[in-house]
Amino acid sequence: SVLSAMEANILSGQPLQAAYAAMDDANFYNVTLKNFAAPWTNREQSVFVPLNDYIATVVGMIRDDVPFNTLFSHNLLYVGPGTLPPYSNFNNDHYAQLEAQSIDMMTGLQQTTQSAMTGLPQNAVAGVWTTRAAAEAFFVAGTNRAQFRFTMLNHLCNDMEQVHDVKLVPDRIRQDVSRSPGGDSRLFLNNCVGCHNGMDPLAGAFAYYNFNEETGTIEYTEGVVQDKYYNNDTNFEPGFRTADDSWMNYWREGQNQFLGWAQGGPGSTGSGFGAASMGDELANSDAFASCQVKKVFKAVCLREPENAADRAQADLMVSSFKAGYRMKQTFAEAAVYCMGQ
C-alpha cells in the first residue's frame, strides 16, 4: 500500500521517496491537484468549479513531469478515456463526466494535442491559454487584457499594482485608454499609464483570439485583429492601434527587471509575435518559478513561507524547480520540509 511504501522510505532515510509514494495516489491528482489548479481557471479564483480542460491539462503536465515553463506555449491537452462523451469545442461535458464518474486522473488522463482535438492551427496554440476554459473565462468580451492580468496574478504572483511603473515609454498604450479620465490628465500620468505601458505591449500577443459566447467556442482569426482591440478607439485616437499579434516586453527595463527575465535560452527574446512566444517570455522568468514554489508551499504546508527558514527553503525549491521545471518534485520537497508540522 501507499502507506507501507512511505513508511519503508522514511525508515530508510529517504523522505523524498516517501513523498513521491504519497503522490502515487488518485487523491493527489483528483483532489489536491484539481483544487490547486481550479482557481486559475475562473475570474472569481474559485476552487468550486467543475473539472475542465485547463485543470486536466495542468494535472496531466504535473503527472507526466512535462516542464512547467511550457505552460503557456506547449501544444498539449489532456483528455479522459474513450468511454466518456468526446471532447467538444462547444461545451465542457467531457470533463464534467470525467469528474462525475470519479475517473482516476492518475491513470485515466491521456495526453494529446490541442491542434488534433480542437482544430486550432498549431501556431495558434499557446498551452493552457488556449484551452476552452481559459478562453471562456479570459478571452470573453472585454479587450483580452484579462487573460494577461490573471496570468500575472495566478502565475507570477503579482497583480498590476505591484508592477506599476510610470517611467516606461507609453507608445503602445491602446486607443481605448483615456489620457485624461474625467478630464484630469494627472490621473493618467500618475496612475493608468503605469500599468498600461507594460501590459498593453505584452497583451498584443492575444490580438487574434476571442471566445464566442453564442457558439461556446474559442475563435482564432489569423492575421485579423479582433474588433475588441478597437473598442472605444475614439477615447484617444493618437493611441496605439493594434495591427497584428506582435508583443514587446517593456518590463525588461526599469523597476520590473526584478521579475527576473531570462537572458538566454527560451523566453529571452523580449519581443515577438503570437501568444506562445509571449508565454515563454513569462514562464521563463524568476517570478514565474518563485510563484509556482510559493503556491505549492502553501498547498502542502497550509501557510505561506513566513520566517527565514521558510524563505531559505523556498529559495532552494526555486533553484531545484528551475533545473527541470518538474512540479511533482516541488510538491515532494515541500512535503519533506513540512513533514510533521
Task: List each language-model region with its residue ranges.
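Active-site-surrounding "flap" and adjacent substrate/cofactor-binding loops of secreted or lumenal enzymes
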Residues: 2-22
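Extended surface/linker regions that mediate inter-domain or inter-protein docking
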Residues: 17-202, 283, 287, 297-300, ...
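Electron-transfer interface patches adjacent to heme c in soluble/periplasmic c-type cytochromes
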Residues: 20-21, 134-144, 178-179, 185-187, ...
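Alpha-helix boundary/interfacial micro-motifs
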Residues: 171, 213-215, 341
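Short cysteine/histidine-rich zinc-coordinating motifs and their immediately flanking basic loops
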Residues: 204-209
